[in-house]
Amino acid sequence: MIKKKKKKSYTSVYALGQYISMSTHKARRVIDQIRGRSYEEALMILELMPYRGCYPIFKLVYSAAANASHNKGFKETNLVISKAEVNQGNTVKKLKPRARGRSYPIKRPTCHITIVLEDRSFDQQYDEYLMYLKNPGYRNAKINLPCYETYSSGGLWDKK
């Protein structure tokens, strides 16, 4: 099996929660609501949703933001949840004692949750820089536009 090398990302950070005792279906129901949203908006949504799976996901999103601000110095206002995935973990099997010496099996599903946050401020700066490289008069065009309109309309010049 050939493994791909992961590129080092300078604009994203992640938090990984493993063996969270919750069904993957129930966790995905919550994760689908916050995928692609900003960090602050996701926290508000997670606080107000009535599901039991919201609290572990809330802690993971908060931890990923703490990683972003501490390790890479990102501002929390620019963070966006770029990737959020839920994978199935091990199933913990227990025996519940019942009447007359019998026992019933109990299955506790677990899941692994990955939250990836991305800093959007770098993308905006990069896009502006590319526009500047493609068109050197990019910023000056915005400034000189009103003057050009006044001259082209014939307001100031009295041409014959």
From Swiss-Prot:
Tree of life domain: Eukaryota
Main location: plastid
Subcellular compartments: Plastid, Chloroplast
Gene Ontology CC entries for this record: chloroplast; large ribosomal subunit
GO annotation terms (biological process): translation
A Pfam short name: Ribosomal_L22
Database matches in PROSITE patterns: RIBOSOMAL_L22
Coiled-coil segments: none
Keyword Protein biosynthesis: no
UniProt keyword Protease present: no
Keyword annotations from UniProtKB, A to Z: Chloroplast, Plastid, Ribonucleoprotein, Ribosomal protein, RNA-binding, rRNA-binding
GO molecular function terms attached to this record: rRNA binding; structural constituent of ribosome
Function: This protein binds specifically to 23S rRNA.
Subunit-structure text: Part of the 50S ribosomal subunit.
Family per record: Belongs to the universal ribosomal protein uL22 family.
Protein name: Large ribosomal subunit protein uL22c
Species annotation: Aethionema cordifolium
